[in-house]
């Protein structure tokens, strides 16, 4: 067998094995404990039976698409804040880098840091080159995956998230 055939066989095997572990609608979302740019540590468990959450995974801070997505969420976050949901952006960047990125883009929502890449791998967003793919995961109050968006338009991220949350039946936030 030639080296090209061996490589092709390995790649096919890898793609088949990866496709069998993809996070799907109805799956229990993997728990996580991640530090955020607001100084807090968040877990999936803390939202159980309380609130839906959205995690918008992005490849790397300070890159063009990620900056556009972050600005969309910062500028149009009111659309999401009107709904009974907590939303995050998440990457495998260091907490310090994410803090700088959040400050530069005036993000008024937490950015999660997963430098170990374990949570990104559990959420099946980690690409073969070690960075997350731009995927957004919607999780219900029960901790189950409601939707995985693998086709993100960075410039309309906030609007698209709000529309999807409404489509998924996430209610508006109750006045306190």
Q: Where are the regions a protein language model picked out?
A:
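Bacterial N-terminal signal peptides that target proteins for export
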Residues: 1-8
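Bacterial N-terminal signal peptides
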Residues: 9-17
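N-terminal "domain-start" segment that seeds a small globular fold
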Residues: 19-45
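Short loop/turn microsegments at loop-to-beta-strand junctions
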Residues: 29-30, 52, 133-135
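Short active-site neighborhood of thiol/selenol oxidoreductases, capturing the structured segment around
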Residues: 45-67
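Structural microenvironment flanking redox-active thiols in thiol-disulfide oxidoreductases
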Residues: 67-105, 116-121
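Structural micro-motif
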Residues: 107-109, 127-137
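Thiol-/selenol-based redox modules, centered on thioredoxin-like
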Residues: 132-176
